[in-house]
Amino acid sequence: MKTVPAMLVTPRSFREFFILLLGLWSILCKEPTKRIGEECRVQLKIKRNSSRSAWTGELFKIECPVTYCVHRPNVTWCKHNGTRCVPLEVGPQLHTSWVENDQASAFVLYFEPIHLSDDGVYTCSANLNSEVINSHSVVIHVTERTQNCSEHPLITASDIPDATNASRPSTMEERPGRTWLLYALLPLGTSLLLLACVCLLCFLRRIQGKEKKPSDLAGRERETNLVDIPVSSRTNSQILTSETGIYDNDPWSSRLGESESTISSQLEGNKQGIVYASLNHCVIGRTPRQASKIQEAPTEYASICVRS
């Protein structure tokens, strides 16, 4: 009797196959750092002959870049005192923290604030599996602050992620606000200047208009007087023409006698005066409308007699 191939797969063989599969999976998923130990050494990447400067009263910090594999090492800071490196005591003025990102990790030492006694040489050391690794030294030069040293910027709490008790504002953050305020005030100042110029021009024009009004009124009064004078003369000339029309029928001798008698009577009243006689002729007005209505009349001339 022949056996079926499906009957060869027994529970025992299936269990052995599953164990073999798990072993292969664990080998393939093992960390590459576990297989290659040389590429996974702890490194402290502080540059040789590093030096930093600070002023007393500043919030200061120094960093120790650390490269490690899986387990993070125990990192500490120490300060050199002669031939020894004394570990630093963490307190309110000195504290440490880890700063990690995608590219690298760093163990940071914070001075809040830094004092003149903090001047010296500092070293970062890492301890992993009883193996101690020391970094290069960092020299910190602390200078006492005076009134002339206020131009140096301060490291504030905005630069330190773990500082929570910092109360001083950042001077670098205030400068952009002042520049934007200056840019906003410039258009306002120019608009106020233009408004002042427009108001000044309107005021000058109003003064000139007030000065011109009296001169215009005087000129108009003179024109009206000049226009009114010919009208009165025309009315007198019309009256005279109507009166002189009576003497047209008289003979020349009677008119001479009457003129002599009138002249003699006037001279007796005023012996030292001068008698003027007006010419009786029509005066043509300035306006063409009034001149068209006046009828021309004959002109009479009178003699003037002067006696001393």
Swiss-Prot record:
Disulfide bridge map: C40-C69, C64-C124, C78-C85
Protein name: B- and T-lymphocyte attenuator
Function, as annotated: Inhibitory receptor on lymphocytes that negatively regulates antigen receptor signaling via PTPN6/SHP-1 and PTPN11/SHP-2. May interact in cis (on the same cell) or in trans (on other cells) with TNFRSF14. In cis interactions, appears to play an immune regulatory role inhibiting in trans interactions in naive T cells to maintain a resting state. In trans interactions, can predominate during adaptive immune response to provide survival signals to effector T cells.
Extracellular topological segments: 30-183
Gene name of the encoded protein: Btla
Subunit: Interacts with tyrosine phosphatases PTPN6/SHP-1 and PTPN11/SHP-2. Interacts with TNFRSF14/HVEM (via cysteine-rich domain 1).
Molecular function via GO: signaling receptor activity
Post-translational modification remark: Phosphorylated on Tyr residues by TNFRSF14 and by antigen receptors cross-linking, both inducing association with PTPN6 and PTPN11.
Record-annotated Ig-like V-type domain positions: 32-134
Membrane topology listed for this record: Single-pass type I membrane protein
